[in-house]
UniProtKB/Swiss-Prot annotation:
Function comment: Alkaline thrombin-like serine protease. Has fibrinolytic and fibrinogenolytic but not plasminogenolytic activity. Cleaves fibrinogen chains Aalpha, Bbeta and gamma chains in that order. Cleaves after Arg and Lys residues.
Protein name (Swiss-Prot/TrEMBL): Alkaline serine protease NJP
Additional facts recorded: On the 2D-gel the determined pI of this protein is: 9.2, its MW is: 33.5 kDa.
EC numbers: 3.4.21.-
Cystine crosslinks: none
Regulation: Inhibited by PMSF. Not or very weakly inhibited by EDTA, EGTA, beta-mercaptoethanol, benzamidine, aprotinin, iodoacetic acid, pepstatin A and SBTI.
Thermal effects: Optimum temperature is 40 degrees Celsius. Activity is stable from 30 to 60 degrees Celsius and.
GO molecular function term, any single one: serine-type endopeptidase activity
This protein's UniProt keywords: Fibrinogenolytic toxin, Fibrinolytic toxin, Hemostasis impairing toxin, Hydrolase, Protease, Serine protease, Toxin
């Protein structure tokens, strides 16, 4: 795994986690 691939994977997973977090807080 190259650094670029790691960073892009990390960014996409962080974006998905942020969306889940916002959806979770929006439902409460």
């Amino acid at each position: 795994v190259t650094v670029v691939q790691y960073r892009s994977t990390n960014a996409s997973s962080g974006y998905l986690n942020l969306r889940v977090y916002l959806l979770d807080t929006g439902l409460r």
